[in-house]
């Protein structure tokens, strides 16, 4: 009886799983590890940072997602930009982003970080942090709720799990 490659893989997987082994691809394991051990660095600029603190507190407990807030960009792989980004603060944001190790992700939180928000037409406001750093996930709201932030983080985890191998992100950097 001849089997196709997929049937052989399925038979091997069933046989090994009955013995307590796991058969998977290395890319899947790497994606799972990266997605479930994010180390965010906060870049709280305004009132959205208060909602971010609420999401990290005991009611929502971001630690259950494997997140550990880090004070240094060199130890972080996720930057959460929360609040109004001014023209004076933009070079500092870019410098902190450049100090992060690859692979790195950015989550833009709130209307001000996404597109300038209420202060969109002010001369001193950057109309979206995506003009300075590449953004992976946008969380809308003014300010967004803690639930919205956690939903955005879950979407980022799904995105990270879809990436394969040791290739770094091919996003355009400015």
UniProtKB/Swiss-Prot annotation:
Cofactor note: Binds 1 [4Fe-4S] cluster.
Keyword Transferase included in the entry's annotation: no
Domain of life according to the entry: Bacteria
Topology of this chain in the membrane: Peripheral membrane protein
One Pfam short name: Oxidored_q6
Keywords: 4Fe-4S, Cell inner membrane, Cell membrane, Iron, Iron-sulfur, Membrane, Metal-binding, NAD, Quinone, Translocase, Transport, Ubiquinone
Binding site for [4Fe-4S] cluster: 47-48, 112, 142
Catalysed conversion reaction: a quinone + NADH + 5 H(+)(in) = a quinol + NAD(+) + 4 H(+)(out)
GO molecular function: 4 iron, 4 sulfur cluster binding; iron ion binding; NADH dehydrogenase (ubiquinone) activity; NADH:ubiquinone reductase (non-electrogenic) activity; quinone binding
Metal-binding in keyword set: yes
GO cellular component: plasma membrane; respiratory chain complex I
Its job: NDH-1 shuttles electrons from NADH, via FMN and iron-sulfur (Fe-S) centers, to quinones in the respiratory chain. Couples the redox reaction to proton translocation (for every two electrons transferred, four hydrogen ions are translocated across the cytoplasmic membrane), and thus conserves the redox energy in a proton gradient.
Subunit structure, as described in the record: NDH-1 is composed of 14 different subunits. Subunits NuoB, C, D, E, F, and G constitute the peripheral sector of the complex.
Protein name in the entry: NADH-quinone oxidoreductase subunit B
Originating species: Rickettsia felis (strain ATCC VR-1525 / URRWXCal2) (Rickettsia azadi)
Taxonomic lineage from the root: Bacteria, Pseudomonadati, Pseudomonadota, Alphaproteobacteria, Rickettsiales
Gene giving rise to this polypeptide: nuoB
């Amino acid at each position: 009886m001849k089997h196709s490659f997929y049937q052989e893989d399925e038979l091997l997987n069933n046989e090994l799983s009955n013995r307590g082994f796991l058969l998977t691809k290395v890319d899947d394991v790497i994606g799972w590890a990266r997605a479930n051990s994010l180390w965010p660095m906060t870049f709280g600029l305004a009132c959205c940072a208060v909602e971010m603190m609420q999401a990290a507190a005991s009611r929502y407990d971001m630690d259950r997602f494997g997140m550990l807030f880090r004070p240094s960009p060199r130890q972080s792989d996720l930057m959460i930009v929360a609040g109004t980004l001014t023209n004076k603060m933009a070079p500092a944001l870019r410098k902190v982003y450049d100090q992060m190790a690859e692979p790195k992700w950015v989550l833009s939180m709130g209307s001000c970080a996404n597109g300038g928000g209420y202060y969109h037409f002010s001369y001193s406001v950057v109309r979206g942090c995506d003009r300075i750093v590449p953004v992976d996930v946008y969380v809308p709201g003014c300010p967004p709720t803690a639930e919205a932030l956690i939903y955005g983080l879950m979407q980022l985890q799904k995105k990270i799990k879809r990436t394969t191998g040791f290739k770094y992100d091919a996003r355009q950097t400015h």
